[in-house]
Structures are given as C-alpha cells and as structure tokens.
Amino acid sequence: MTILCSCAQQQQQQQQDTEVITSSERTTYNFNVDWKFIKSNPKQAQDINYNDATWETISCPHTFNDVDTFDDLSHGHHDGEDNQWRGTVWYRKHFKLPKDDKGKKVFIEFESVRQIADVYINGVHLGQNQTGFIPFGFDLTPHLKFGEENIIAVKVNNDRGDHFRENFPLVWNHEHWHPTHGGIYRNVFLHTMDPLHITLPLYDNLETVGTYVYAENISEKSADITVETEIQNEHAENKNITLVTQIVDNDGAVVAHSNKNVAIPSGQKMKVTTVTNIQNPQLWYTRYPYMYKVVSAIKESNKVIDTYESPLGIRNFDFNKDSGFWINGEQIKLHGWGQKPTNAWAGLGAALPDWLRDFTFKLMDEAGGNFIRWGHCAASPAEVDMGDKYGFVTLMPGVSGESEDEGETWDIRYKAFKDLIVYYRNHPSIFIWEGGNWAESEAHYKEILEAIKTFDPKGKRLMGNRRADVKNDSEGYVSIEIGTEGWEREYPDLPIIESEYNREEAPRRIWDKNSPDDNFYNHPNISKNTYKLSSEEFAVRQADHWWNKMGKKAYHSGGANWIFSDGPHGGRCPTEVTRASGEVDAVRLPKEAFYALKAMWRPEPQVHIVGHWNYEVGTKKTMYVMSNCASVKLYVNDKLVGTNSNPENGYVFKFDNVAWESGKIKAEGFIDDALKTTQTKETTGEPAALKLTSITGPEGWLADGSDVALIDVEVVDAQGRRCPLAKGRVDFTISGPAIWRGGYNSGKPNSTNNLFLDIEAGINRVAVRSVLESGTVTIMAKKPGFKDVSVTLKSLPIDFNNGLTTTLPQVYTNVLTKEPLPEHIPEMPEYIPGVKNRSELFRKFSYTGDGKAMLRTNMHWGKKAYTDLEYNYTVLPRYLNESEYVRTPNSDNRYWARDQLQFIAGKKMHIYVLHDDTVPRPEFLLRDYEDTGDNVNVVGASMSVFHRVAEEGESIIMAGNSDGDAPENCRMYTVMVKEFK
C-alpha cells in the first residue's frame, strides 16, 4: 500500500510539473487608477489627514506638461523646447487593502518618475529617487493599515538640469536630450506576497535582485538554462521549501522543469540556482523572436506560496570587427532607430499608455527595423518587452546627458546603472549596455565593468560608450565602438555599431518642390534652418546616409537612424515646433521617409514611389522609387517610362523628366528578371468629404482615466481616396465622458490641445483621454464646404475597488511569424581593413584649452573636425589624405593662450594648420607658416591651409585661435601632419 501511494504521489507530482503554475499568494495590482493631483506645492501634503478633496482626479501615466509641449517653434541651435512649466507638484492616492492581507509583504513599484520623487506612506517618508528613467520601489508593509484607508503621497519636481548650473547634478533632465515632462509618467504597481517570496528586481532601496536567467551551451539540439532565484524569508521561523522552475514555450507548454529542496533560514535572503535543459530549442532571432518564459514557484508542503515569471530568449551572437553582427550563425545588418525614452506625443507629452508605446514599436517593425538605441536614458519596461517580442537588438543606457560626470552626478548615474542591469538583465533583446553618452575616466570605466560583472556575469553582453574615441585609453575598457554619424572607425580592433546617424530634418507637410509648400520656403525663420528639406528629399537621402555610412561596409554591424518620431528635443529648424528628424511625425503619421526605409529594410521585395501623383498640368519632374529589388520599371498610365537597373546608394531608382499625366503611376520591382512586387499611385479627384477613423487599444478604450483613443481626420475625394494636397482648418466638438487632447501642426506654435487643427498633406490625427466614467463619446468634425462627420466611441468600464484593480495595462499580442531572408542585397564593396589610430608623429602632446582634444590618424573626406560638434571635412585637398591630425573642441574658437597646443615632432614632417578665414590670423601662424592658397571646407566654412616643415625632435607650440573678438559661428583651427618624404 505504501508503495502504491508513493507511485501515485509521484505520478501526481509529474502531472503538476507539466502544468504551468499560475496561482499563488502573490497579487500584482495596477496602481495607476484614481490619484489626486495638484500643480502646486502645499505644505504638509504628505500628511495622512491632509484634505485633497479639491485636487484634480487623474490616473497614471500622467504628466502635467501635456498642455504646454509641442507648442513653441524650435530655437534651432540643437536646443529643445524649454518653455514648459517646471516646479514642485503633489500626487496622493487613497487605497485600502483587504484585512486578509495582514501578514503579507506589500511593495510599491514605480516604473519611473520625472524627475525627483519623494515618496510617503501614511505620512512616513520612504525615500527619494532622482533618476527619472529607472524603476524603483519601496517596502510599504511596516506602515500599512490593513482593512483601512492608506495614503500614498508623492512629491515630484521637474526643475531643469543643466551642465552649467553649479551643484545641479541631474544633467540629463534637460530639454536638449529629454524634455522635462514632469510627473508619474509611467506605470505604478502594488505587489502583495507571502513573507516567504521571490524578491523583486528593484535594487534601489530594496536591495533585491529577483531572478537571473541565462542560457549556455546553445545549439539547435539543446540549451542549458540556468535560473538564479533570490528567495527571502521574513517569517519568524526557518522554512523548508521546494523551488519549482518551469520553462514554458510560446504555446504555453512546459518544455523543461526542475524541483530543488532548500532550507531558507528566518530573516535571510538566499540565491538558489537551478539548471534545466531544453531539447531542440527555438532560438531568438531578429526575424523570429521566439520567447519562452520561466515560471519560478515556491512550494511549502506541496502548497504554492509564491510565483514569479521571467522572460527568456535563447540566442548566440557575435559582434565581429571584420564581418559585423551574427546571430545564431546568421550574418545580418542591424538597422533601426535611436528613440528618446520620453517617446513624447503631441497633445499627450511623455505620459502614454503602454499600447501607444506598442503602437510606435509596431510601426518600427513594419518599416523593417531590427535595432534600437535608447538615447540617452533607459526605455520603459513595456518598451523593453516590445524589443523582445518584435526582435529589436537593443543598445540600452542607464541615465546620461553628454558629459563625463563627477561627484554627485556620477554617483546617481552609477547607482542607476546598477539598478538598470538588475531590472532588465533577463531580456534577450538587450545586447549592449551603454555606459554613457560620452567617454568616461578609467576609474568610472572600472566601476561600470564591475557592475556588469556583479549583476550580469553570464549575459555575454558588450559594453560601450558613445564617443569613447574622445579618450585613447577607452579601448582598454569598451568592447564595442559606438559611433556617431557613421564617418569614422577609430578602433580597428573592436566591432562597431552606429548610435546616431542622419540628423537631418523635414516636416511631413512639405511634399516636394513641385507641390504647394505651405509658405515653408518663405517662412521668416527659414534662413535659420540647418535643414531646408522637403519630405521627398528627406526620404531619398535616407539611402545615402544608410548605405554610405554603414550599409555597404561589410565590417560594420549597422546602426540607428536618429530618430524615429518627431519630438520637442534638440531641433535645428526654427520653422518647426519639433525636431523633425523622425520617419513619423509627433502623432506617428508616417512621412515618405518611413516608406523609403521600409522599401530598403523589409526582407520581402518592396517598391515605393516617393511622393504623390497630383501635379499641375505641364509638370515634369524627377521621380524616385525606393526599392530593395535589383531593377525597377516605371509606368505612367501603363506606358513604360523607363527601366533602371543601376540604383544610387543601393536603393534609389531615379527617373528623370517624368511628365505628369492625370491617372496612374506604377512601379514594378524585379529580381533576377522576375517580377516581385508593384505599387501604384493615382491622381485623386477634388476634395469631397471629411473622413474620421478611430484607433483604440487592442482591448478597446478603457475608462481608467489615462487611456487614449486616436482619431484620424482625412480629406477624401468622391471615391474615398485621400487627397494628398488637401490642407486647411478643421473644427471639432466633443461630447461625453472624455478629455480632449487634440494634436498639433508641425509648423504652427500653440496648436496643441485646441478644438481645431489644420489638415497636413491630406490627414491629421487627434487624441482624447478617458476619464473614470465609462460611456459614449462623440467627436464631430467640421470644415467649410464639407458635410459634418462624426465618430462615436465607447469607453469600457474597468473593475476597480478601493483604489485597486488587477486589470493590467494593455498591449498588442504579437503573432509570431518567421520572416524570410532578403531576396536581394545590394553588392557591398570589398572589405577595407581597419588602420592604426595611434600617432607616431605627435610626441608628448598636450592641450591646455577647455574641453578635450584627441590625436587621430588616416585623415580623409568625411572625418569629424571637432570633439564637440558633428562637423565634418567636406572638401579636402588630396595631399591631406592619410594625415595624422588633432581634433580639438570648437568651443575654444575665441580662447587665447600662448601654449594651448604643444607637441614634439616625432619625425621630420609637414605641419598643416587649417584656419577659419573669418577669424583674425594669430601671430604664430603669420610668423611661422606659409599660406598654401588651398582651402578646406567644414560644413560651409572655408578654412585656409597653412604649411611649414618641422624637424624631428622640434618643439611645436601653437597659441589660441584669436586674442580678439571673433564671429559667433567661427571655427577653431585644426592641425594635420604628414611624414616628410
């Protein structure tokens, strides 16, 4: 009988092990719903008895800057939008936990708060977080009243950080990088669990690390999965438990499991390690991002006490200095975008429901992206999940501005970096930890690497800093070169990835120079624009930037186009209210550049005719077709215009002097003479009607106080086709329980949050927020000469009581499909091996000016001129090719000192000084050098070339650029040397 019982128990245990464990004592509440908010700093607002009855009712994600962003023209000069309300505000939330939860542990988790958050529970200060972008949490348990009302209070401050404000450490809280959209702008969760539990990955304050999951010995036949689980026992007695680990596949089946009996002493945390093996694992590819999940469960006396889920993706990868990026034995080129972690949306600011973040990711996936670099702070947890599910190799920073930081600033950054690793280390999409947006000191590099060694020793991830080339000794610490603007390879012994290329800007509303321009080219600020591109030019130039900077370079891993969506940060065009570098605008409506990159990057054969087909009679123009095919044919009204088998920059098929005719234009794409794909565009009729289309989350529009519904408004012809040249004002009315948030016009200040909006290129998009009351909402659109149209939405009630709901934020469900490999890739030139980058001609080099100077080798056209600006040499006499050279900060253009730059000639050599013609020539230049009569061009500035010969061992001293006033836009001189032969 005993034997029979034992067998039955074993059989029951085996059955339990193959069923996914889903229930336990743990509950995660969505803590976003029903907060009180005031846009001021009242005294004692943290007190439990403070009367907040008159405060505004809101739900998170929430920002108090949604009403004052995207509404000012850019200053240019790479500044972001700075005319936003800043100061201290308060949030309070009333909630009640069941009496039955007494004895449980309760933790609050903030995905992040901008910028400084002081958190209180029932009047007790729990702590402060200053990172603005990294999740953090607190233990509420000792201060809670179970079965009674509790008050969480959060004091939030979004004052501007600045490199130039003394004693203000938060340099990344600055509109240049991250517009200061203050508030609890990401999700908040409340976790309740048994005192015997798996910890949360919230290192700050809690000093807990959760699970650490990694795969080893990976092949197509098997993979070993190690799970390190941190278990905490806060019971008064020791506990004997069984840790169950289940590996669950994408279909929900348990494919591997293990049981481990462990004794957990009272009051202790323990790391328990288990190893399981998966047979015939599905591997994680960018084109097939297969995800498993790990279920960790604590059982005591066969009762499930606690469960915790972790993501798992199994992949081998290699960043190779000679052949680029490899994943699971496949060589691919990485292509995608840099994106701001604020991910701001016109009318909504940085406070977006998760499904809208997913909406943006789906667009990036549609356009063929497989790489994302978050700049220059960490993405939200939802966005990291999306990187996993859509197959985006991720370059992930902590928090950074653009500087080498010291003191308190570094302390905050380093603490945030450790928190980042602990929270995100299980995500397979993260391949590179970014130490910072600038080179670090050796001491800081050592700390960064120590953090990775401590918290992610088995992840095999690389570490790099953007602009690590500022310091020659970076190479001893970074394991990948993170480039900028694609021009240079400073470290031939390291693999290279591009973090920011193509910073050009163009608004969606300007089609081309043959179409109405909305007075763009006559705008009073147009002369101040760094870029004056139409949507057509911007689209076509995508191929130039991509192909020449990294696409055609076999050794290059690929890179991030800067950026995906227009936003109020770092713009250079004061005709616009955003930085207009995005492939989509600030409400995620695609520009022609979006479709251009889709035609370049999607694996399926693609053709895209750039622009529209609604021109005036007599128009002849160049038509561009973007395609990943080998050849393209173009037709107008079924008459062959031409065949092009010789694309520019790999993907641009150009057809000159195409005569417009009303009707159709069609492009056909061919590979190996076989027709693979077509696209047709038509001449639309006269504008005849307005059309409204609503977009909601995958589960509908939720009445949770923070959900968003989008409404597209189009001008269409009698056949319902969008009229591409339509513009003009549309007025809206709204009725029902909702808050109007509107949209924006890209070239008009103060266009957000209004009940009117201009159509741009035939379409625009507005947003409405839900409130806590469900019901029917009707939006009506009116435009003179058109019939009024309306769309009706229903906001759906959610189940929440006592301030709590278990309805978690919604996102799209990704249907996993295996994308094909590209059928055609443009031929790459032969690989050119890297060259040395250590100077032999400069000895004992020193530089005493402000900022940093560096020595470089192998000068050629396109190299950067300065350490602090993205200015390149665009015209260069041939004899300067392959020079060794000095790169200084341009910020010293008006700094004078006798010994600003000094070195000893390593060999007999030619010295060339390139000097801005608008600046008075300094004494040393006039005395010691001869004007060659040649000129170099640096982004439009003409620089005269001066020359002398120096003997080996000769000491060379160069003074400052000028001891008098110099023009505001002048350039610092630069120095090149070549061995005398």
UniProtKB/Swiss-Prot annotation:
Class of the enzyme per the UniProt entry, highest EC level: hydrolase
Localization, UniProt: Periplasm
InterPro entries documented for this protein: Beta-gal/glucu_dom_sf, DUF4982, Galactose-bd-like_sf, GH2_Domain-Containing, Glyco_hydro2_dom5, Glyco_hydro_2_cat, Glyco_hydro_2_Ig-like, Glyco_hydro_2_N
Catalytic reactions on record: a beta-D-glucuronoside + H2O = D-glucuronate + an alcohol
Induction pattern: By ulvan and rhamnose.
GO biological process: carbohydrate metabolic process
Molecular function in Gene Ontology: beta-glucuronidase activity; metal ion binding
Main location: periplasm
Active site: 500
UniProt superkingdom: Bacteria
Gene Ontology CC annotation, any one: periplasmic space
Enzyme Commission number(s) of this protein: 3.2.1.31
Residues engaged in binding Mg(2+): 561-563, 581, 583
UniProt entry keywords in alphabetical sequence: Glycosidase, Hydrolase, Magnesium, Metal-binding, Periplasm
Similarity field: Belongs to the glycosyl hydrolase 2 family.
Entry function: Beta-glucuronidase involved in ulvan degradation. Ulvan is the main polysaccharide component of the Ulvales (green seaweed) cell wall. It is composed of disaccharide building blocks comprising 3-sulfated rhamnose (Rha3S) linked to D-glucuronic acid (GlcA), L-iduronic acid (IduA), or D-xylose (Xyl). Beta-glucuronidase removes GlcA side chains present on some O2 residues of Rha3S. Can remove the GlcA side chains from polymeric ulvan or from smaller oligomers.
Protein name: Beta-glucuronidase
Classification lineage: Bacteria, Pseudomonadati, Bacteroidota, Flavobacteriia, Flavobacteriales
